[in-house]
Curated annotation (Swiss-Prot):
Its cofactor is Zn(2+). This is Small ribosomal subunit protein eS31. Binds 1 zinc ion per subunit. It comes from the Archaea. A zinc finger (C4-type) spans 21-42. Part of the 30S ribosomal subunit. Zn(2+) binds at C21, C24, C39, C42. Keywords: Metal-binding, Ribonucleoprotein, Ribosomal protein, Zinc, Zinc-finger. GO terms for molecular function: structural constituent of ribosome; zinc ion binding. It holds the Pfam family Ribosomal_S27. GO terms for cellular component: ribonucleoprotein complex; ribosome. The lineage of its organism: Archaea, Methanobacteriati, Thermoplasmatota, Thermoplasmata, Thermoplasmatales. HAMAP family: Ribosomal_eS31.
């Protein structure tokens, strides 16, 4: 995935499309999988809720 796919421009402002890792801080995005979000740097994982 390229960096330009992680951001978009709205009203002349840069908006991040992905969530940040709460452990690593800003700049480290969580990867989105089918059933979870995970950080490739520290291994932090959040599971998605089934509705």
């Amino acid at each position: 995935m390229e960096k330009r796919e992680l951001y978009e421009l709205k009203d002349n402002k840069i908006v991040r499309k992905r969530r940040f890792c709460p452990r690593c801080g800003p700049g480290v995005f969580l990867a989105e999988h089918e059933d979870r979000f995970s950080c490739g740097r520290c291994g932090y994982t959040e599971f998605k809720r089934k509705n």
